[in-house]
């Protein structure tokens, strides 16, 4: 898993998306890729948790309405945060049996494929002038790490969110907007642990991505964006003490998470925030998709979010996209799907359910709700993304 950072310029949003994973098949044989190829569209993805699975189905429903003759072969890769998808896809590509398309973070995560010419240039077939004009410019740049457009971004997630149960914090007398930096959050955890019966922070340690994500926000909150960008750029000289400090604070945080953290998924942990058994959750804003689908759990009155302490003004982002592998078993169906994924209709259906904002600027925000509309304003006003 790559280290997530603030996206911008040519740097990718190659952090981690959520999901508890589910076992899927290891792929299906495609056609020979000649002419239109197979009418089966095989999609490898990792969207298997409740809210994200609903969003994925909303995307497929819209595609089926426009292309009812295409048979979709749904192939979720097992493992949280896409932890298994690279192995699955790379093995398939090496064996000459690529899927029709697969989910991937644009930016640096694409380079192992573009370096080996394993992705088709879709600059003419998919990225027409209307689509290019509608997309946010820095997101378009992520789709062409080697110059040619090879991916279609479909969403933008923010990672440095600190979600909380409003009534739990009200009862404890905690104002999350007053928390002063990552160290201040530890003090709040200590207070909650000593004075209440709730778990201070919902969290999973079954797979490492949630803790890595949390460490990144701690580091940015303590040291700032410039130090973080230096670190992920490979220049670690002079940052050893800063890295150790963030790791120590992460270890301190993990004293205040659920006892069963090692056996649960992120969304199972998030249920504790919904039920009032946990106060906080550090997670990407896909967590909001779960809140949206919960009964009688409303934004601002029941749950809310502040930027992780110390990271106000930073939109630490991760973006999902789909690509067109070379040797494609279903070139016509894949092109149709990528065209749809980049459309207003697809992004209007998918993102409100997913808990993400659209990379197109012309998607109506009416169905996104107050939280995602606020996130979109945060994105536009952030000084680092």
Name each model-derived stretch.
Residues 6-112, 116, 128-131, 297, ...:
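Conserved N-terminal structural module of periplasmic/extracytoplasmic solute-binding proteins
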Residues 46, 60, 64, 248-330:
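Extracytoplasmic/periplasmic substrate-binding proteins
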Residues 50-54, 62-65, 118-119, 286-293, ...:
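Mature extracytoplasmic/periplasmic domains
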Residues 65, 144-214, 222-261, 271, ...:
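Helix-loop-helix "hinge/cap" segment bordering the ligand-binding cleft or interdomain interface
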Residues 76-91, 105-108, 180-187, 260-275:
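Short helix-initiation/N-cap motifs at beta->coil->alpha
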Residues 93-104, 118-120, 195-199, 275-283:
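Alpha-to-beta junction loops
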Residues 105-159, 370:
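Hinge/lid segment of periplasmic solute-binding proteins
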Residues 123-137, 141, 178, 201, ...:
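Short, solvent-exposed loop/beta-turn-alpha elements that line the ligand-binding surface or hinge
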């Amino acid at each position: 898993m790559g280290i997530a950072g603030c996206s911008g310029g040519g740097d990718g949003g190659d952090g981690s998306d959520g999901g508890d994973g589910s076992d899927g098949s290891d792929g299906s044989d495609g056609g020979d890729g000649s002419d239109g190829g197979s009418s089966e569209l095989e999609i490898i993805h990792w969207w298997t948790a409740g809210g994200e699975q609903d969003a994925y189905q909303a995307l497929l429903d819209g595609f089926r309405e426009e292309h009812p003759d295409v048979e979709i072969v749904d192939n979720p890769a097992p493992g949280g945060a896409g932890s298994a998808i690279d192995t699955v896809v790379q093995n398939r590509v090496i064996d000459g049996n690529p899927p029709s398309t697969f989910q991937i973070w644009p930016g640096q995560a694409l380079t192992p494929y573009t370096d080996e010419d394993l992705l088709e240039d879709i600059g003419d077939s998919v990225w027409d002038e209307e689509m290019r004009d509608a997309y946010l410019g820095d997101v378009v740049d992520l789709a062409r790490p080697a110059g040619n457009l090879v991916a279609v971004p479909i969403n933008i997630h923010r990672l440095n969110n600190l979600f909380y149960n409003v009534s739990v914090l009200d009862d404890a007398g905690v104002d999350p907007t007053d928390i002063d930096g990552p160290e201040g959050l530890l003090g709040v955890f200590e207070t909650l642990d000593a004075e209440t019966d709730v778990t201070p922070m919902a969290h999973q340690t079954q797979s490492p991505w949630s803790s890595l994500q949390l460490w990144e926000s701690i580091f940015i909150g303590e040291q700032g964006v410039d130090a973080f960008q230096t670190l992920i750029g490979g220049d670690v000289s002079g940052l050893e003490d800063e890295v150790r400090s963030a790791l120590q604070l992460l270890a301190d945080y993990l004293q205040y998470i659920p006892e069963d953290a090692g056996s649960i998924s992120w969304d199972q942990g998030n249920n504790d925030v919904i039920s009032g058994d946990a106060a906080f959750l550090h997670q990407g804003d896909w967590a909001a998709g779960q809140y949206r689908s919960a009964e009688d759990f409303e934004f601002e009155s029941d749950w809310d979010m502040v930027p992780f302490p110390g990271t106000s003004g930073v939109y630490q982002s991760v973006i999902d996209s789909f690509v067109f592998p070379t040797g494609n078993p279903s070139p016509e169906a894949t092109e149709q799907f990528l065209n749809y994924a980049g459309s207003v209709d697809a992004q209007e259906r998918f993102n409100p359910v997913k808990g993400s904002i659209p990379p197109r600027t012309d998607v109506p925000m009416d169905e996104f709700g107050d939280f995602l509309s606020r996130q979109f304003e945060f994105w536009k006003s952030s000084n680092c993304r």
